[in-house]
Amino acid sequence: MNSLLMITTCLILVGTVWANDGYLFDKRKRCTLECIDKTGDKNCDRNCKKEGGSFGKCSYSACWCKGLPGITPISRTPGKTCRK
């Protein structure tokens, strides 16, 4: 029973450590995904979930995501924005 609890705890920690938070970044266009503050939250949430994140919102006119997989390209700052 203790082993099962330890394994579960480790898996939760690994998932937390490997999850990234940041702005969705298009490597090809070299820009972050553009949105309209507040009204763009639904689109950002949809795009973030499509990329494997837990949720997304519009922040500083760019889509910010929480819980993205480690392989998803992100930017820590909004920077130059582009349309999807």
Curated annotation (Swiss-Prot):
InterPro entries named in the record: LCN-type_CS_alpha_beta_dom (IPR044062), Scorpion_toxin-like_sf (IPR036574), Scorpion_toxinL (IPR018218), Scorpion_toxinL/defensin (IPR002061)
Lineage top rank: taxon: Eukaryota
A Pfam short name: Toxin_3
Annotated disulfide bonds: C31-C82, C35-C58, C44-C63, C48-C65
Keyword Nuclease: no
Keywords: Cleavage on pair of basic residues, Disulfide bond, Ion channel impairing toxin, Neurotoxin, Secreted, Signal, Toxin, Voltage-gated sodium channel impairing toxin
Subcellular location: Secreted
CDD domains: neurotoxins_LC_scorpion (cd23106)
LCN-type CS-alpha/beta domain sequence ranges: 20-83
UniProt main location, coarse: secreted
Signal peptide: 1-19
Tissue specificity annotation: Expressed by the venom gland.
Cellular component per GO, a single term: extracellular region
Molecular function in Gene Ontology: sodium channel inhibitor activity; toxin activity
Function text: Beta toxins bind voltage-independently at site-4 of sodium channels (Nav) and shift the voltage of activation toward more negative potentials thereby affecting sodium channel activation and promoting spontaneous and repetitive firing.
Domain notes per entry: Has the structural arrangement of an alpha-helix connected to antiparallel beta-sheets by disulfide bonds (CS-alpha/beta).
Family membership: Belongs to the long (4 C-C) scorpion toxin superfamily. Sodium channel inhibitor family. Beta subfamily.
Name of protein: Toxin Cex12
Organism whose genome encodes this protein: Centruroides exilicauda (Bark scorpion)
Lineage: Eukaryota, Metazoa, Ecdysozoa, Arthropoda, Chelicerata
